[in-house]
Amino acid sequence: YMPVPKLKLEPIRKKYDELRDHGILRGFVWGDQAGCWQHAACLMDISDLIVSAMERPTWVHELLHVLLEKKLQFIESMKGAAFDLIETGGGSASSTVISPELHKEFCLPYDTAMHEALHGLNFLVTYHTCGGTHGIEEYIVQNGADASETVAPPSVGGNQEPWELKRKVGARIALIGGVDQHNTLTTGSPEDIRNKVFELFEKVGVDGGYICSASDHFFDTPVENLKVFAAAAKECAY
């Protein structure tokens, strides 16, 4: 028993009108996580899910199909929602958790179906993998997402540098993230922050299609560091 709620559009429009051009209003797809595999990993232990995918793949696909149908039902209620961007995916589909082979079989087809439905309502989609993208770059492109995040560097748990990902995907998909939220943004010096922003702009953002941002949440970052980060980003111009 898992009823699917309908999205209320009025509060979203109110927030969108308040925010205007001062930020990006993100939306979501219903569930503990937006992606089907990722949602399943919240319903059962991820280790058990991985073992089941190898030993009982038909059962896992049946579960994912049930979740997909519910998510598509929710997406229908999103028509007209004033979101700038819809986040899908989730960390348990990253290549730091599962193999590219498992991602291809148990994530790609379901992600693609959701993204097609979202694009049918004229939404832009960003696919979240918590930085573990090595080996699944082509699948992220193939699933139809408009952007890939969080482009986490190895220093904060990713498995390739942001510019390595950029070289592989080129201009086929936008990238969001790239800044180590702890070692650079929280504990780094102003010069460290500025240098990293400029490096990312030159190596990742040189051809456009890049939003320079932290690779994950930052809870203890000094406000002054955020100001340095924002000021450095403003200096990056084409």
Place the predicted regions along the sequence by residue.
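Active-site loop segments of alpha/beta catalytic cores
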Residues: Y1-Y238
